[in-house]
Amino acid sequence: MSFAQRLRKFRFDWPQRVAAVLLLLLLVQCYWVARHQTLTERDYEYARCGREMWEKPSPLAGYFTSCGNIHDGTLAYRAAGLPLTVERIFAGASSQNSPWELRHQLTYVLLLMRLPFVFCGLCLGAALWWVTRRLFGNEGGFVALSLYCFSPEIVRACTYPNPEILATFGFFAAVYTAIGVAHAMQGPRRKWRPRIVLLTAAFGFTAAAHVLAALLAFLFALGFMVYLAERRRAALIPVMLYSAIGTLLLLFASYAFRPDAFSYVFRSGAARMWFSFAPAKTFFSAMPNAGVTLAAGIALLLFATVRRSRYFGNLAALLIALALVPIVTTGVPGEPWLWALPFLLTFVGGVFADALETPQRKVFLAATAAVLLLQAALCVASLPGLAR
């Protein structure tokens, strides 16, 4: 089926409209927070280093940018600097000038820098809805997306320059693309290639955001593909080999094909990690996240007691969430608990969708609505704190 045929088959019915409204509400929250923020030294660092990556090499010998060697991924810097570079090009200004230099007069500079991160957050929400709707139906998709769009931590991650929302999107996309590749391997070979290319792009995106996220995503993807490929397991070796080579090439490209800068990926300790439940405890005990915490607790209880909830779609998401939650990065700053959040919401959406198909549907429907309304109210109430 050609792309044009697929486009003609696309329908924007009520499920898509509800999802679009939820994503629009997330966009409104991000816009409100960004409008009430002020520019910081972190913004300046990301803007300056990002512009240098796009426009000119560092004047300092042996360094990729004037910020020094980038040890926590280039993608966030490039994302923050790209809108400023594009604006300068369209304005016809010299590369020595930028809207950043007029940041005190131009109020939209802060919004420009946050656009790529907000866009990535919206893409992650769309991917979460698409996956959960495919796996669990409309109800599972709406539960997961509602909790996502009214998660204060998602709004926070979308409204300042950082690699975490980028790594979270890449991680989620890589794992479920790998599952899709494993399913496609049961069919004709002509359907493999586009999915393998997409898988490579997802791994490359994740690696450019955070090396540890890419390594963990690769391990989970390999494990699920070995489990699902069945009679095609022998073909996994070349598939994963091509994906790994393509990922390294994309990561090399993110360093502008400069070997010295690229070598720092292997010398910076960016993939070092340890285990601690402190970040997860902070997240689940915070009042603005009470709705997510309550939903996760209910989902775990139902998963343990209701047999119909224990199948691959729910179990896979739960395993990844449980594996990521206790991980902490020791080499560079990172938030693996945030990488786990979309998988946790996928699990919640799946279990709630199963509960809504039982004879006690009305009771579960009322409980689900109460949890979602609680989380939405808490998220909106927390927005002023996020803007500070």
Which residues fall in each region the model found?
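Transmembrane-helix signature of polytopic, membrane-embedded enzymes
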Residues: 16-20, 92-100, 128-150, 190, ...
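Perimembrane helix-loop-helix junctions
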Residues: 2-9, 180-186, 215-247, 303, ...
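Short acidic/glycine- and proline-prone juxtamembrane loop motifs at membrane-interface regions
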Residues: 39-41, 153-166, 333-337
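Short helix- or helix-capping micro-motifs
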Residues: 26, 144-149, 176, 203-207
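Transmembrane signal-anchor helices characteristic of membrane glycosylation enzymes that use polyprenol
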Residues: 15-44, 55-61, 150, 244-259, ...
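Membrane-interface transmembrane helices that cradle and orient dolichyl/undecaprenyl
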Residues: 133, 174-196, 206, 352-356
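Transmembrane-lumen/periplasm boundary regions of multi-pass, lipid-linked membrane glycan transferases
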Residues: 205, 223-308, 319-331, 374-388
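Extracytosolic helix-loop segments that constitute the early lumenal/periplasmic catalytic or substrate-binding loops
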Residues: 44-100, 185
